[in-house]
Amino acid sequence: YFRGESSAPSVENAVNGLMQLAEDSHISNNRFQRDVVDAMIRQVSSNETLPFDGPNIIPGVLFASDYDLGPMGYAYSDADYATYHINTDNFQAWNQGWQYRNDGVDIENSSDTDGNGYQVGFTSEDEWLLFTVDIQESGFYNIVTRYASTSSGIFSLELDGIPIVDNIILYNTGSYSNFVNKLTQGLYLP
C-alpha cells in the first residue's frame, strides 16, 4: 500500500494490525538480550569490555558462552563475525549456531548436562574469547576443559595477556554431543 502497489487496508484491518504490533512489542512478549542492548548502546562509543554476568569466580565454573561483553577484537575474535549481505548479496551467518548471543561467536544449543545449555562451536585458528575472572586465592589450580568434537585441536590460556599454558590438546571425541573432560594440572594463578 505505501509503495502504491495495492489498495489501502480497511480501517478494521489497519487497527487489528496495529494492535497485533503493540501486543508483539509488549515487554512480556520479548526477551531481554543483555549483549544486544550493550552492543547497540554502549559499544558504539566504547571498546571497553565488561563481564557478561559479573566476574567469573575462581575456583569455579566458567562457561565458554559467557565471555565478556565488548566488540570484536576486544571481547572475542571470530573468523566470521559479521554478515555483509546487503552490500554483497552473499549471506554469511555471523553466529553459525544461531543461539544465545548476537555477537560473531558461534554458539549453539548444547545437550551437555554439565553445561549451561550452550556450547561454543565452529572454532578455527586464531579465534579467542575474553573472560573477566576474580581469583579468590593465589595458588596452583587444576583446570578441567569440558568439550566435544569430531576432530582434534589445541588451545592456550592467558592471564592479563601473559601465557599461562600453551597448546592444551583436545582430542576427537567422536561426536559433537559426546562430551569429555580434559584435565590440565598445576596452573599457577596469582
What are the residue ranges of the model-derived segments?
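Extracellular glycoside hydrolase catalytic/binding regions
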Residues: 1
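Low-complexity, serine/threonine/proline-enriched polar segments
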Residues: 16-20
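Extracytoplasmic
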Residues: 25, 29-190
